[in-house]
Amino acid sequence: MASHKTFRIKRFLAKKQKQNRPIPQWIQMKTGNKIMYNSKRRHWRRTKLGL
């Protein structure tokens, strides 16, 4: 990744960074909840973004 990024790329990376987190604990605690973990987690070494 170049150190000089366009704003579009930077915005794209920022969004992916925000998406890449576990689900909040209070969501796990909700009644009738079936979501136990974030299935769309991405590891920087295993799965690349395809830029």
Swiss-Prot record:
<protein>
    <recommendedName>
        <fullName>Large ribosomal subunit protein eL39-like</fullName>
    </recommendedName>
</protein>
<dbReference type="InterPro" id="IPR020083">
    <property type="entry name" value="Ribosomal_eL39_CS"/>
</dbReference>
<dbReference type="InterPro" id="IPR000077">
    <property type="entry name" value="Ribosomal_eL39"/>
</dbReference>
<comment type="function">
    <text>Male germ cell-specific component of the ribosome, which is required for the formation of sperm and male fertility. Replaces the RPL39 paralog in the ribosome of male germ cells. The ribosome is a large ribonucleoprotein complex responsible for the synthesis of proteins in the cell. The male germ cell-specific ribosome displays a ribosomal polypeptide exit tunnel of distinct size and charge states compared with the classical ribosome. It is responsible for regulating the biosynthesis and folding of a subset of male germ-cell-specific proteins that are essential for the formation of sperm.</text>
</comment>
<dbReference type="InterPro" id="IPR023626">
    <property type="entry name" value="Ribosomal_eL39_dom_sf"/>
</dbReference>
<dbReference type="Pfam" id="PF00832">
    <property type="entry name" value="Ribosomal_L39"/>
</dbReference>
<dbReference type="GO" id="GO:0002181">
    <property type="term" value="P:cytoplasmic translation"/>
</dbReference>
<dbReference type="GO" id="GO:0003735">
    <property type="term" value="F:structural constituent of ribosome"/>
</dbReference>
<keyword id="KW-0963">Cytoplasm</keyword>
<keyword id="KW-0687">Ribonucleoprotein</keyword>
<comment type="subunit">
    <text>Component of a male germ cell-specific 60S large ribosomal subunit (LSU), which contains RPL10L and RPL39L, instead of RPL10 and RPL39 paralogs. The composition of the rest of the complex is similar to classical ribosomes.</text>
</comment>
<comment type="similarity">
    <text>Belongs to the eukaryotic ribosomal protein eL39 family.</text>
</comment>
<keyword id="KW-0689">Ribosomal protein</keyword>
<dbReference type="GO" id="GO:0007283">
    <property type="term" value="P:spermatogenesis"/>
</dbReference>
<dbReference type="GO" id="GO:0022625">
    <property type="term" value="C:cytosolic large ribosomal subunit"/>
</dbReference>
